Structure formats: structure tokens, C-alpha cells
Amino acid sequence: MNARTVYNAVSMNFSTTVRLLLALASGVALALAYPSFNIPLLGWIAPALLIVAVLGARRRFAFLLGWLQGAAYYSLTVPWFYTVMRQYGLLPVIQAGAVFALVIVATSLFHAAFAAVIASVGKFAPERACLAVPFVWVSMEFAMAHLPAIG
């Protein structure tokens, strides 16, 4: 059994709803891998769920799936951001919530770009997408860490 057989058997048969649920589950699982919840095994499972959801999807839909994964992840891992805006930024409830939402929207774009790249690479050769995943993920993390310092 080669990668193409697995790809055809698994990825091509998922409905839109299943793909959306996989992306959401991926974001929740990734959040659960971090110290607040401390289930480190999910750190390996979460990206795999997103990859399975993205392979075989169109690039725009893959972008949405990645964004959904990022939004779920950041919503669960940085809720303290809202508190900081309220207590130290002295923002009213609605404005602090809006800033929190904007942060989630912006940071989730990196996950969306990751998913779109993997969908593009995997369109004709899923095995290449699987090989590209670590490089694209590390590139995404590097960009997230250094983007504010680039300008």
C-alpha cells in the first residue's frame, strides 16, 4: 500500500462537514497539548488531523480549514489576552473583545497559509505534501516569531 492508495482511500471521500470538524478538532487538540491542559501526545495528532482534512481540498477551502484550526487553537490558548486588554489596557468590554478577536483573526492567518500550501503541494502528489509539512510548519513558526521585527 503506497501513499497514493492511502490518499485516495481517506482524503478524497470526506464531506465538507467532516473536513470542517477535523480542522476544528485539530485546533482544540493542539490547544490541549499545551501546559494549561498538558496532553502532549495531542501535539502530534493535531497537525495530522489538519493535514488529513486539507489533502484533497481546494486551496481556498484549505485556507478556511487552516484558519478555523488556528482560530480554535488561539481562542483556547490566549484567553488571557482579553484580560490584559481589560485590566492593563483599560479598554471597555466590547473593545477588549474586538482586539482579542482581531488578534485571533490575524494569528490564524498563518495556519490558513500553512493549510493552503499543503493543499497546493498535495494536489497532485500527496506524498510530497507529507514531506513538505515539517518544512512549511517550521517556516510558519519562523514567520510568526520574526514578522513584527521584519518591518
Locations of regions flagged by a protein language model:
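Membrane-embedded alpha-helical bundles of multi-pass enzymes
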Residues: V6-G151
